[in-house]
Amino acid sequence: MELDLEICRTIAIRYGLPLQFVFKEFCLMDVISQIAAITAREPGSLVFKGGTALNKAYLQKMQRFSEDADFDLVTKNSDKELYRFSKKLASEINGYMITELRRVRYTMQFYCMYGTPLGGEDHVRIDISSKRLRTAKPLENNMIISEFTHSSVSGIPIYSIEDLTARKMHALADRAEGKDLYDVHMALPMCSNKVLKTAIEFMLKSEGEEEAVDSFVQRSIARLKKSDPKKMRNLTNPFIPSASRPKSWEELKNDLLAMLEDFRAGL
């Protein structure tokens, strides 16, 4: 994809994002657009998920920058089918140097390499997992929108806000990174608590974990309490437009803890 340096610089200044992030945003949206066109021939087989899906489809003007795109391939957990699909998809993406497929646990991963206007090289990472479809709500067909490049993509099924938030809460419980805190804090008020509880139940089954919702939320709270807000701020602020950056990550953390406690109390 050809990138216009001056346009990218203007966007970087406007949103307070690093220039290389703006380069990647254009390429990320381009790759997602190509994937939408390629998979339109097999509707319903690929579902958009993860932080990029949550931010681009639901958080809108509060969205942060995202580095990669994650998808679930709806199968009966066939490794051969996952490999075949991923290899075919990678071969049909144009305008990038595509790396060899590699398996990372239960996921097939490849990189779409591109050159930047400054002479450097970067990539968009694509992760595809094989999953059975277990959702609290039907899949959505929301427009995927970049507030930074003002580009949009349609045609890829996406999990509901509750199903995406349940998966983000799983990431929060496991690693409690700043991106997870930001995403869950922004998404939780948009969720129906009743639907979210069901979404967490299905998510835990999908991950092969035998755990009650109450126990899972307790674990998320405990993990978040141990997190370092200063470290979160330093690592995550570059991914958030300057106008949307939390004034205090300590307050953001405490606010989310209160929200999670309220959610748990209503279970």
Language model regions located:
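Structured mid-to-C-terminal alpha-helical surface segments
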Residues: M1-L46, K56-A69, L73-L267
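Active-site glycine-centered loops adjacent to acidic/histidine catalytic or metal-binding residues
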Residues: G51
